[in-house]
Amino acid sequence: MALIPYALARPFLFSLDPETAHELTVRALALTQGTALQLAYGTSRVNDPITLAGLTFPNRVGLAAGLDKNARCIDGLGAMGFGFVEVGTVTPLAQPGNPRPRLFRLPQAQALINRFGFNNEGLASFMANVKNSTFYRQRQNPNLARKPLPLLLGLNIGKNAATPIERATEDYLTCLDGVYPYADYVAVNISSPNTRNLRSLQSDEALDSLLGAIAHRRQALVAQHGKQTPIFVKIAPDLDASQVDVIAASLRRHGMDGVIATNTTLSRDAVKGLAHADETGGLSGAPVLAMSNRVIGQLRAALGPGFPIIGVGGVMSADDAVSKIRAGADLVQIYTGLIYHGPKLVKQAAALIKTSC
């Protein structure tokens, strides 16, 4: 599939059910991992290094979580020119997610609506896939060829749907224990709209309790593994300024290393009247750009300079990526833009950020 220009592949993919197209893409990327072709793609990655949270990112454009839920195609995705790739969300136990259909295209708006519900194969399978990747094996074997600035890997964690919200912290800590030694950074997903009550973890007391427990567990993990893995928290766009301030204060108070802004939105204002606009789930793509940038700007004002922000939501062009940096983000992630415009968007965005920001 890597041999086919995306402009030719897209009509075929868009003729399929959206989730079938998603699964086909993931399988194709998994099959091409480690090939000379994929490694060749990786050598053309835009070189624009930046150091944040103690990590040196090869460039400022990454893949958002959600495309590779089970860490099956880390190498294939990394070869698209990303500076970093985030996989997951993973939960302690395997779960099927919500019933199909659960992914919908809104092409007139360059948008998607999903209600996947953290469908994944569980932590044990997820970590086996991470360890089986060329990415991981190269890090373990200094005799294998390594790029001057290797791809960075974020592992995104969540809670099982069956876990009561009052016990959510247990799931996050279980996942943190499992992913910690292998991640360049850990992303704590408390903002998916597709797991019941998950977003309540963004409220003042619940967030303090969760982040306090995560910070405490990390102290033990640092002692156990001899490394301090940065922890980022992923938040929603459906927040007002006072809620953003509460979250920013909690991030600082508990020593979190960064924030990912934002997840999908529940708002349908920008897509009213379009087919599938009334489907339940999170809306991503072009309609989220302004909402996400607003939250990024509010976070930057609340957190001040120097606190790492990963901007995600609505990046459909290189100019959109630059707008996130100018709103206050340090790094940018892409997902829905990749579906609509293909891998060329990665390098276009990274190149324009390099020359404009």
UniProtKB/Swiss-Prot annotation:
Q: Which Pfam families match?
A: DHO_dh
Subcellular location per UniProt equals:
Cell membrane
Recorded hits in InterPro entries, A to Z, give: Aldolase_TIM, DHO_dehydrogenase, Dihydroorotate_DH_2, Dihydroorotate_DH_cat, Dihydroorotate_DH_CS
Q: Per the record, what are the reactions this protein catalyses?
A: (S)-dihydroorotate + a quinone = orotate + a quinol
Q: Which cofactor does it need?
A: FMN
Top EC class, one word = oxidoreductase
Binding residues for substrate: K69, N114, R115, F116, G117, F118, N189, N194, N263, T264
Membrane topology is: Peripheral membrane protein
Q: Which pathway or pathways does this protein act in?
A: Pyrimidine metabolism; UMP biosynthesis via de novo pathway; orotate from (S)-dihydroorotate (quinone route): step 1/1
Q: Does the keyword Flavoprotein apply?
A: yes
Q: Does the keyword Flavoprotein apply?
A: yes
Q: Enumerate the GO terms in the molecular function aspect.
A: dihydroorotate dehydrogenase (quinone) activity
Give the GO terms filed under biological process for this record: 'de novo' pyrimidine nucleobase biosynthetic process; 'de novo' UMP biosynthetic process
The record's active-site residues are S192 (nucleophile)
| Stored HAMAP family | DHO_dh_type2
Subunit description: Monomer.
Fetch the PANTHER family from UniProt.
Answer: DIHYDROOROTATE DEHYDROGENASE (QUINONE), MITOCHONDRIAL (PTHR48109:SF4), DIHYDROOROTATE DEHYDROGENASE (QUINONE), MITOCHONDRIAL-RELATED (PTHR48109)
Query: Which family does the record assign?
Result: Belongs to the dihydroorotate dehydrogenase family. Type 2 subfamily.
In Swiss-Prot or TrEMBL terms, this protein is called Dihydroorotate dehydrogenase (quinone)
Organism annotation: Albidiferax ferrireducens (strain ATCC BAA-621 / DSM 15236 / T118)
Q: What is the lineage of its organism?
A: Bacteria, Pseudomonadati, Pseudomonadota, Betaproteobacteria, Burkholderiales
